């Protein structure tokens, strides 16, 4: 690969509806004008402050799937499946931007990579408006004041996250990572990582749709859920892309075997990008509600959460932050 090119990818321009086209206009003059070929690029991804990096990068690091993601030298690194080739990205928070180092297999994928990274880190959120709404609740106000600007860790691949959400049902973070790593080793697409220990792209639904269920070290009911999900994703019966109607996607997910409210809402929050998704039955949310004197039964907490709309996914980040868990701490 050639020398690193430094680009400032403006947050406001990239947040508009034609984000990819705007990004192309910004970056093409800085790259060689060849139609294809690999490239190494360094970008600054600005955001509207404040941004609390602890839960954002802590969550990504604590749940990293070996071979696909890692925390290395102060950066979250992962592989990316892009239109023309695979890529590796390293992301590190700074005071007013996120450093983004891309190793692209094909330079034509630069705009797509920028868009995915901004989506993953929720960089186009408006923390001022969100925090103002949440801080109006006396129980949440101290949490917002302590660490303003919490973002929702999202995903670069909605299908990947949906599969991982199923693998994470009713198991520890470590167990979920182990199950996902086995899928990656068996079915992922190998990729070269010039700077670290990443080895694969996460397998796409088509690669998983034909797998032998006996190879999954999961309870039989969970195997059925995984296979039903990947079949629906591979066939297009379920579309988790950015243009998907949220309630339609929720309804299709609910129709799958093994999909309860927690799984549907976690996918809505992380994969579909619904800012109002609310997994009210999540154990961490329930424990936080109890500690704050909020109602803790699902129905009562759902009623209380109406005051946080349309930003309940962000309220969840503040509630989760009350717990002592690695997802709340950015690694050194």
Predicted region positions:
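HhH-family (HhH-GPD) DNA N-glycosylase catalytic core used in base-excision repair
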Residues: 1-332
């Amino acid at each position: 690969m050639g020398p690193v090119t430094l680009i400032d990818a403006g947050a406001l321009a990239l947040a508009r509806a034609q984000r990819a086209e705007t990004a192309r206009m910004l970056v093409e003059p800085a790259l060689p004008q060849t139609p294809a070929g690999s490239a190494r690029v360094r970008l600054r991804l600005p955001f509207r402050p404040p941004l609390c990096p602890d839960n954002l990068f802590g969550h990504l690091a604590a749940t990293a799937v070996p071979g696909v993601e890692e925390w290395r030298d102060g950066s979250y690194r992962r592989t990316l499946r892009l239109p023309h080739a695979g890529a590796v990205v390293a992301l590190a928070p700074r005071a007013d931007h996120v450093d983004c180092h891309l190793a692209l297999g094909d330079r034509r994928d630069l705009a797509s990579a920028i868009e995915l990274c901004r989506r993953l880190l929720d960089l186009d959120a408006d923390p001022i408006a969100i925090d103002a709404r949440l801080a109006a609740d006396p129980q949440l106000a101290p949490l917002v004041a302590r660490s303003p600007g919490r973002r929702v860790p999202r995903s670069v691949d909605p299908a990947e996250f949906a599969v991982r959400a199923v693998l994470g049902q009713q198991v520890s973070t470590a167990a979920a990572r182990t199950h996902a790593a086995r899928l990656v080793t068996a079915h992922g697409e190998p990729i070269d990582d010039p700077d670290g220990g990443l080895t694969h792209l996460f397998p796409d639904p088509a690669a998983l749709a034909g797998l032998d269920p006996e190879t999954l070290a999961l309870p039989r009911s969970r195997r059925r859920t995984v296979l039903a999900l990947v079949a629906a994703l591979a066939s297009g019966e379920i579309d988790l892309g950015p243009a998907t109607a949220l309630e339609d996607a929720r309804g299709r997910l609910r129709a799958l075997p093994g999909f309860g409210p927690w799984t549907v809402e976690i996918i809505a929050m992380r994969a579909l990008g619904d800012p109002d998704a609310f997994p009210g039955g999540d154990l961490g949310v329930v424990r936080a509600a109890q500690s704050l004197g909020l109602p803790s039964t699902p129905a009562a907490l759902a009623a209380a959460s109406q005051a946080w709309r349309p930003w309940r996914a962000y309220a969840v980040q503040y509630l989760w932050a009350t717990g002592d868990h690695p997802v709340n701490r950015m690694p050194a």
